[in-house]
């Protein structure tokens, strides 16, 4: 598709859409317990304030894909039954409806050193018991296809000033979670 405004190019890429899931009380409770035990991680953008939301994303994926815990928490979060090592990236949101296909999924600049096979992206609502599994991308494909932003850069597609150097992809550019092995 031809695009006359180069800033709008990001709207035309990919067909993936986020999958809405209901968040259970059990998932909330497990995530809260784990977050309290974890404390503050080095390089945490929110100084540990979002640990519970991150853990909730992990609990959702654990249940959906029947994953087991990582035996190397510094490199990945969960392992699928087939042995695929997943790093779960969760963003909290005040939205109550599915994120738009052009919304961004991010991996911080220091995370590419992690030894995982794929990144899985979620958005978790702070207002309702819903989450959206935005999709996944193999680490190799993500690092090849994502757009890099340095701290202080402004993303021309949405005017967002980047707070930490990161790699971004739109939800529409990810692979649907049902394609994970």
Task: Please report, for each region that a protein language model flagged, where it lies by residue.
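Nucleic-acid endonuclease domains
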Residues: 1-84, 89-181
């Amino acid at each position: 598709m031809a695009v006359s405004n180069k800033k709008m190019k990001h709207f035309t890429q990919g067909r993936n859409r986020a999958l809405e899931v209901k968040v259970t009380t059990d998932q909330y409770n497990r995530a809260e317990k784990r977050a309290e035990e974890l404390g503050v991680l080095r390089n945490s953008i929110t100084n540990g304030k979002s640990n519970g939301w991150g853990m909730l994303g992990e609990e959702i994926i654990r249940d959906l894909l029947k994953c087991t815990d990582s035996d190397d928490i510094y490199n990945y979060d969960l392992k699928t039954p087939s042995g695929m090592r997943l790093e779960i990236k969760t963003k909290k949101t005040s939205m109550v409806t599915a994120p738009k296909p052009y919304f961004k999924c991010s991996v911080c600049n220091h995370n590419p050193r992690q030894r995982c096979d794929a990144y899985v992206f979620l958005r978790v609502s702070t207002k309702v018991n819903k989450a959206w599994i935005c999709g996944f991308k193999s680490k190799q494909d993500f690092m090849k296809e994502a757009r890099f932003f340095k701290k202080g850069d402004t993303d021309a597609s949405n005017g967002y000033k980047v707070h930490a150097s990161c790699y971004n992809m739109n939800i529409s550019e990810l692979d649907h979670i049902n394609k994970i092995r």
